[in-house]
Amino acid sequence: MTTSARTSDLTRELARARARAIAAAVPDPELPMLTLGDLGILREVTADDAGVVVWITPTYSGCPALREMSRDVAARLAAAGLGDVEVRTALSPPWSTDWITPAGRRKLAAAGIAPPGPAPKRAPGPVPITLTAAPAAVDCPACGSADTVRTAAFGATACQDLYRCQACAEPFTHVKEI
């Protein structure tokens, strides 16, 4: 490998790492205390002489924030001078709340939102429609009590539900396990 080829490879790797850091720092439009990196939806970033390609996975099919996230990522990367930018969507494997980073879970709790527990395990292939048991107890992010009740199946977004703590009487949002 020639020196210029090694330099070109290094330049591409530095551009890829820079693009990944910029894309990972974009805030989620629905949960602005979290970044796309915190949510774990940033799947892959490639860079070459022509520009950058970023792959993201929506938190669920039909996520209304996907278009805005894609635009925000593209705008930030273009503003950083990284050439042509393309943001693509990866639907497989589907996103899981297990992909939320520990830092993201701490940020949710600090914002008064109960982070999700472990996602239910599913077999690969089509998702069967079944009746499920009542949701598991969710700890209150304010006082830590497990004495909570779900008050609504949907919160500000479809991926959230609403709870109230019986111990401290605080209402709070919970991110559903997906």
Q: Positions of the model-derived regions?
A:
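Domain-level signature for proteins that mediate thiol-based redox and metal-cofactor handling
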Residues: M1-I178
